Every structure is written in C-alpha cells, then in structure tokens.
C-alpha cells in the first residue's frame, strides 16, 4: 500500500471515529433532555444526579476525542501526521493503526 493510500485510510478512520463521537454526544444530549423533562420522585434524585455526572464525564471525553481527531486531520493536511510531535521521528504504523489520532511515537507515549 502506498503512503498516499495509507494516509487516505487513516483519514477515513479518523472521520468515521469523529462521526461516532458526535453520535454518542447526540445520545448524551437526548438522555440529558429525558432526565430534565420527567418529574422524578425524591428518591430518584441521587440516581438522576449520578447519571448527569456520567454524562458530563462523557462530554469531556468526547470533546477531548474530537479535538485529538481534528488535530490529527490538521497535521495530515500539513504533512506532519505520522511524525512524533516530541522527537520528529516517524510514528510506528502499528501505533497509528491502533490509535490513528495519536501525535507521539510509542517511546514518548510512555513518558506522557
């Protein structure tokens, strides 16, 4: 597979992952709306708060994922996608296949 084909494959995976994260976020918004619309018994308040906390954590994680994916796509446009941001050496293809939005090689991933 040529480098250009490989980059195209990674780009498709990044966009697909971003779409999945957006879909998860949409589900979180719907769940939050359902929680706010229904009158609940006082005993259920703690459960509702726990669910809201989980949704907030998901929102943070989703935002981080989207930002990482967008950074990877931007690095791709700049021709820097497969280079480690720390040392400038190439990021292992196996690592990119596992985590296509990564910006560091496996050596520097262990130090972060």
Protein language model regions, located:
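Residues immediately within or flanking Cys/His clusters that coordinate Zn2+
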Residues: 81, 102
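Flexible coil/turn residues that form the inter-helical turn or adjacent wing/linker of helix-turn-helix
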Residues: 80, 89
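A short beta-strand motif that forms part of the nucleic acid-binding face
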Residues: 88, 100
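Short, cysteine/histidine-rich loop/knuckle motifs that typically chelate Zn2+
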Residues: 86-87, 107
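Short microdomains enriched in Cys/His and/or Lys/Arg
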Residues: 103-112
């Amino acid at each position: 597979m040529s480098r250009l084909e490989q980059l195209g494959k990674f780009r498709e995976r990044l966009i697909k992952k971003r779409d999945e994260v957006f879909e998860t976020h949409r589900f979180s918004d719907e769940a939050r709306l359902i929680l706010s619309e229904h009158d609940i018994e006082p005993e259920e308040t703690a459960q509702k708060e726990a669910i809201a906390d989980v949704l907030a954590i998901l929102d943070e994680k989703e935002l981080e994922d989207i930002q990482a994916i967008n950074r990877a796509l931007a690095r791709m446009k700049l021709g820097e996608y497969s280079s480690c941001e720390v040392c400038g050496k190439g990021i292992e293809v196996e690592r990119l296949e596992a985590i296509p939005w990564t910006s560091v090689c496996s050596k520097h991933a262990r130090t972060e």
